[in-house]
Structures are given as structure tokens and as C-alpha cells.
């Protein structure tokens, strides 16, 4: 069979090199596989509910109820729930499950006295990140472990509840680009949309329930506690968690102790004035400026008694003469006299 030459392309090839026919230059390339690689397919397929052990390493204690419409002001469940997954060494002696990208845990809200879920969709009763993938982290004993961390969970309903954590494994199916093209050709041939090809399935490997905790109103909320050692250890390894150095109650106690130490009364008052909000100080200053007696109280202390002024001397009025006449010493406590004395030269003898 003779090949047809494409002479229009010969000019682009060097003259010293032999020309390769156009049809022979086409090298077939394999269709790519659109799927994540599995490090160990035998291990990933061997996981079963009987070989997986899911436990809660850090239990939640208290949560502040989240008001609907104000989710950005919410506070996460404290302390953040943390789970650990262990697989039997007989099934996975090399611990390949630590690198399995198909393991994830979802959370749901359950009643505290019954094994029943709370009625409603998850978005109506929970807020935040409700799914966690596997984190390979160093435990407190410096050994690798598989952990699932929920550092951003809030509850929208008040009461006493528990959290149910369910472990899943995604089992993807391998399909090539040619399979996808055949599916599209079949849709065009039949003139109707067909169900998409199966991308994979998943299986449930178990679940675990947390201890009961309270979801309270802001007036009953005790505040976030100090971050645990486990939370700090995982945060140092790159996990995004909200850390708190001291509990809120301890910080308030420290303020009260430092404020009521060996300070005198004047020093404690000055410290309270410094800690007073600026807006409150401005309101008090405005009230004092509106009161004439408080406005001129400092002025009276400087100019009274007015017995040595030139004005009184020109009138021949002395303190003893005023007292003999049954009059009081001219210490005036009205705003008009004080202003005249300050601004009228005749009152000052100038």
C-alpha cells in the first residue's frame, strides 16, 4: 500500500533528514485516566467496618447557641471535637491507610437520651464545617496517627445534645476519556440526555457518638476555656484551630486581683478612670459642663474669699466690719458674680 505524501510540509523539514510520511508520524496516545491514584489498592479495598476503630479523642463540653441570620458572630463548639482512626495491623501492617485520600467523616446532631437524630436539615441546626478529611499528624507520643478534626462547628438550637460522627470511604471507578466520548455520542444518537457514568460509590465504615454537651444562651455561656494540649499540638502542625491562652474566667479574676492589690484609694480610683470607656468619660464631662455650680467650683477655690480685692477696699468693707453689721463674708457661689469678677476690670481693681 502506497502512502500519500503531503508535499506542502516538506519545506519545514531539514533537507539532510529523511522525510517521514504524515500518517506514520501520528503516534497514538493512550486515553488519560481521570481518577485519583490510590497508594495501595489492596489496602483501600480491604477496609471494612470490622477492621476500623473510630474513637473520640477530645470531647465537646459547651457551645453558645448561634442565632439565625447572625452566623458570622457565632462561636465554635468548645473544645473542638477530634477523632482518631485505627486499623487492625493484620489488615494493614504497613499502615497505608494513613495516606488514603478517600476517607472522610461527617457529623450530625443527635438527642442526648435517645439514639435519634434531631429533626431538620443539617443546615437548619448546624453551622460551619460539617465534614473532615483525614489528617496525618503526630500524636502527643510522637507517633503518626489518622485524625479527623472539627474546629468550626456551631449549633443553632438550644438544649442538650450529642454528636454522631460517621466514617465513610469513597470507592472511585476508573473511566477513560474514550468512555466519556462514547457516552456523549450515544446521547447525540438517541437525542436525549442519559444518566452520567458512575464515578464511584462509597461505603460506611462505622460511627461513634460523643458525650452529651449543653448549648446555652449568651447569658449562661461561661466563655471559651483554655486550649488543650492536643489542640496546641495539632495547631503547631498546620491544622487551623482557634487557640486561647487563658480561660475567660481566669482573665477576669486576674483583673480584679491586680486592681485591688496594695493600691491606695486614690490610685485605685485613677486606675478605674483610666479603664473607663472613652464614650462614658465624654458623657460625664458634658453633664458637668452643663451644671454651672460644677463648672465654677474650681474657680471659687482660687478667688474666694473676696475680702482682699481692691473693690472691697474702696468701699471700706472689711471682713470684721461685715461681721459687725451682721453680714457674711462675701463668698458668692453664683455663676453671675463669678463671671463678673473674672471678666469685669472694676471687680478686679484694674
Swiss-Prot record:
- InterPro entries named among the record's database cross-references: Velvet, Velvet_dom, Velvet_dom_sf
Reading the lineage from the top rank, the first entry is Eukaryota
Q: Where is the Velvet domain?
A: 46-244
Entry GO CC = nucleus
Query: Which residue stretches belong to region Disordered?
Result: 250-296
- Main function: Component of the VEL2-VOS1 heterodimeric complex that plays a dual role in activating genes associated with spore maturation and repressing certain development-associated genes. The complex binds DNA through the DNA-binding domain of VOS1 that recognizes an 11-nucleotide consensus sequence 5'-CTGGCCGCGGC-3' consisting of two motifs in the promoters of key developmental regulatory genes. Required for normal pseudothecium development and regulates asexual spore compartmentalization, pigmentation and germination.
Q: Which UniProt keywords apply?
A: Nucleus, Sporulation, Transcription, Transcription regulation
Bias (Low complexity):
267-276
A Pfam family this chain is assigned to? Velvet
Q: Does the keyword Transferase apply?
A: no
State what protein this is by name.
Spore development regulator vosA
Q: Does the keyword Ion transport apply?
A: no
* Chain span(s) of sequence motif Nuclear localization signal: 274-281
Originating species:
Cochliobolus heterostrophus (strain C5 / ATCC 48332 / race O)
Q: Which family does it belong to?
A: Belongs to the velvet family. VosA subfamily.
Domain remark text: The N-terminal velvet domain contains a NF-kappa-B-like fold and is involved in DNA-binding.
Q: What happens when the gene is disrupted?
A: Produces only albino pseudothecia. Reduces tolerance to oxidative and thermal stresses.
